[in-house]
């Protein structure tokens, strides 16, 4: 005779979680593979107490974002759209022109698209720092090096 009254689901509270800082070197790595590794860390899916509706993930620092690779012909053919919110205000950029203007933007756009939409996704995106080269101001944090494929 089993009674199921004593079984309780335990939820981890974000205030008890110590956030770590991970650094990913993006030089000569594929953009999508870097983005998926970063999102996994940001969401906290690498932890045993992952909860989809809470910010239990860690902070991610990506360096050398300007040296990221693309597969196929995406360097010339991938198009990024943005809108000014005025009639006829649709603008488009190829990967080449966008990365020349702002080298961190393609990686940030890829990661933002993989995060949940809404307040939680915006909160998780604030835990991401992307730098175009190896120089960054976060060396005072205890950074753990993460190897991505």
From Swiss-Prot:
SUPFAM superfamilies: Ribosomal protein L13. The keyword Cell wall biogenesis/degradation does not apply. GO terms for cellular component: cytosolic large ribosomal subunit. InterPro entries: Ribosomal_uL13 (IPR005822), Ribosomal_uL13_bac-type (IPR005823), Ribosomal_uL13_CS (IPR023563), Ribosomal_uL13_sf (IPR036899). One of its GO terms (biological process) is translation. The keyword Phosphoprotein does not apply. One of its GO terms (molecular function) is mRNA binding. It holds the Pfam family Ribosomal_L13. Signal peptide: none annotated. Keywords: Ribonucleoprotein, Ribosomal protein. It comes from the Bacteria. This protein is one of the early assembly proteins of the 50S ribosomal subunit, although it is not seen to bind rRNA by itself. It is important during the early stages of 50S assembly. Part of the 50S ribosomal subunit. Belongs to the universal ribosomal protein uL13 family. This is Large ribosomal subunit protein uL13. It comes from Borrelia duttonii (strain Ly).
């Amino acid at each position: 005779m089993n009674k199921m009254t004593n079984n309780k689901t335990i939820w981890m509270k974000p205030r008890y979680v110590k956030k770590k800082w991970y650094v990913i070197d993006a030089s000569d790595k594929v953009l999508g593979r870097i983005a998926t590794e970063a999102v996994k860390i940001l969401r906290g899916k690498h932890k045993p107490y992952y909860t989809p509706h809470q910010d239990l993930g860690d902070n991610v620092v990506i360096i050398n974002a300007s040296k990221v690779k693309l597969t196929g012909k995406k360097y010339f053919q991938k198009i990024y759209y943005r809108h000014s919110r005025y009639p006829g205000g649709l603008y488009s950029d190829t990967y080449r022109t966008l990365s020349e203007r702002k080298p961190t933007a393609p990686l940030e756009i890829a990661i933002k698209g993989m995060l949940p939409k809404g307040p939680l996704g915006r909160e998780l995106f604030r835990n991401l720092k992307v730098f175009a080269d190896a120089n960054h101001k976060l060396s005072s944090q205890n950074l753990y090096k993460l190897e991505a494929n």
